[in-house]
């Protein structure tokens, strides 16, 4: 089993590169964003709560995210046998520590963290373009600025956390999809 965290700012290409890694290595993909958007679309209790945070560009509380993740892993035991790529999680050091505990209970660990590093102007351009193409409500300029501020304040410290754990691998995320994957 090989578990990978794909790390980067909103719009850095986490979802796109996750798809490439999944196809190449056969890992099970967990996008906490996709899981949450599914709950929002189905108007579940979790979806209603999550939507309040997402629509304001805020992070979902750690305890709630851990519960969602654990439930999702429990429901996909067979699919995750080769390993998991975590896309959009963890986003805080507390979540990283909780993920470590969760995986240790399952006899495994985070093996690598792929950090997609993209300059901020490119991030804004990508996100606004994605918003136009997909109609995602959280891909507008005001929310993008909030999401990037939250990323810098709350998520960026994870980079050093995983560097200290000797698991962080920085990748220049400014190129084409193919050049980034290589």
Regions found by a protein language model. Give the residues of each.
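Glycine-rich phosphate-binding loop of ATP-dependent small-molecule kinases
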Residues: 1-182
